[in-house]
């Protein structure tokens, strides 16, 4: 399936959108083209926010998907064709929607065209750590949609969008209070009732823009985590004899945890070396978003500022005449148009030599 709203199959069954294929439930729920980004075209310069990709992945996972497939996860570069360029244009037959760049396929993806890490690389990485650690528990779980009786309606912001996946005893609660280009309201006095567990003890507010995964009735070593209003991220088993459980405090939500029957309230985040709770077998760490986004990553070598020299070789000629393509939008320049373009010589330091462009 492609991207969509939480519980999209259930929603269609309840009168929204088109009817599902009768055989949909007979196949594993995998995704193939979650929007890791979007490539800008000549006439439509789309900007993708990091939250767009992260929220969609949480929504699909919470809707029952057991495989998160992206288009694209890593940007690329168009190869050269034998007789033409291979970018999509209004003039190509099969893909004549927009004019795309000749060479770059910089998709605003988690990893850029040259491997640079964009902000949603770090947020999606947390989700991938979670699925890697808890995948065997999550995969056989059914998806449940407490708000399934409310068919999706454009502009309806009257209730919290959430689901949970459960095997009857253990569960993960998926929350999405984010929508691209919209500002959803804070959802107040929220309590969940999942697998016979009601939490938190008092109603909480889910701020606008919140995306989170809360655990319910998770057994880890000698710790019974009945619930937590903090996002579960990763279970580290690399240290023989001890288990490290990493969680993230969600901005605007107090972290409340029920551990072995004891309720911890307003738990403050520390760092990845200082646990907020320890038992004989388990250390629990609560991290800020910044720490969680870089959990386990080595400090990166930062780009050092270098002096870039440039000089003008040729002034620009007259402006080109903008033509309208077959889709009634502006066409990108042809090769001949660049004959009148200005030319600059740029010298960029590259290791022990100069890279001339």
PLM regions and their residue ranges:
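Catalytic-core region of carbohydrate-active enzymes that cleave or remodel glycosidic bonds
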Residues: 2-97, 167
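Structured loops at beta-to-helix junctions and adjacent beta-edge loops in soluble globular domains
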Residues: 35, 74, 108-110, 165, ...
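Acidic, His- and aromatic-enriched active-site or binding-groove loops in soluble protein domains
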Residues: 1-4, 94-106, 170, 175
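Structural beta-strand/beta-sheet cores of well-ordered domains, especially the beta-sheet scaffolds
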Residues: 27, 67-69, 103, 169-171, ...
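Non-catalytic C-terminal accessory domains or segments of carbohydrate-active enzymes
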Residues: 116-357
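Aromatic-rich peripheral "rim/lid" segments of glycoside hydrolase catalytic domains that contact
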Residues: 79-135, 139
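Glycine- and acidic
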Residues: 37-43, 107-113, 240-242
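Short C-terminal domain-edge/linker segments immediately following a structured domain
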Residues: 59-65, 101-107, 202-205
């Amino acid at each position: 399936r492609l991207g969509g709203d939480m519980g999209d199959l259930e929603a269609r069954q309840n009168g929204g959108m088109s009817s599902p294929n009768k055989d949909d439930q007979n196949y594993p729920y995998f995704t193939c083209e979650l929007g890791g980004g979007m490539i800008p075209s000549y006439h439509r310069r789309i900007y993708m926010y990091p939250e767009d990709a992260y929220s969609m992945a949480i929504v699909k996972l919470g809707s029952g998907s057991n495989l998160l497939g992206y288009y694209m996860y890593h940007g690329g570069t168009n190869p050269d064709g034998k007789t033409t360029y291979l970018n999509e244009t209004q003039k190509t037959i099969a893909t004549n929607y927009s004019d795309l760049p000749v060479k770059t396929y910089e998709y605003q993806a988690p990893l850029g065209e040259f491997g640079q890490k964009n902000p949603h690389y770090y947020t999606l990485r947390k989700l991938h750590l979670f699925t890697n650690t808890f995948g065997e528990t999550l995969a056989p779980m059914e998806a449940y949609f407490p708000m399934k009786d409310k068919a999706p309606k454009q502009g309806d912001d009257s209730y919290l969008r959430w689901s949970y996946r459960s095997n009857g005893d253990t569960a993960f609660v998926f929350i999405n209070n984010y929508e691209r280009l919209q500002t959803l309201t804070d959802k107040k006095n929220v309590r969940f009732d999942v697998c016979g567990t009601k939490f938190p003890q008092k109603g909480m507010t889910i701020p606008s823009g919140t995306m989170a995964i809360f655990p319910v009735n998770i057994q880890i070593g000698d710790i019974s985590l009945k619930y937590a209003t903090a996002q579960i991220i990763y279970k580290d088993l690399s240290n023989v004899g001890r288990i490290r459980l990493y969680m993230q405090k969600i901005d605007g939500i107090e972290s409340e945890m029920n551990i072995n029957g004891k309720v911890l309230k307003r738990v403050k985040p520390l760092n990845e070396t200082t646990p907020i709770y320890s038992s004989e077998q388990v250390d629990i760490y609560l991290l800020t978003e910044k720490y969680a986004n870089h959990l386990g990553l080595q400090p990166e070598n930062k780009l050092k500022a270098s002096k870039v020299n440039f000089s003008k070789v040729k002034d620009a000629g007259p402006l080109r005449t903008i033509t309208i393509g077959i889709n009634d939008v502006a066409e990108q320049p042809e090769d001949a148009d660049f004959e009148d373009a200005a030319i600059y010589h740029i010298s960029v330091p590259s290791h022990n030599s100069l890279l001339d462009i």
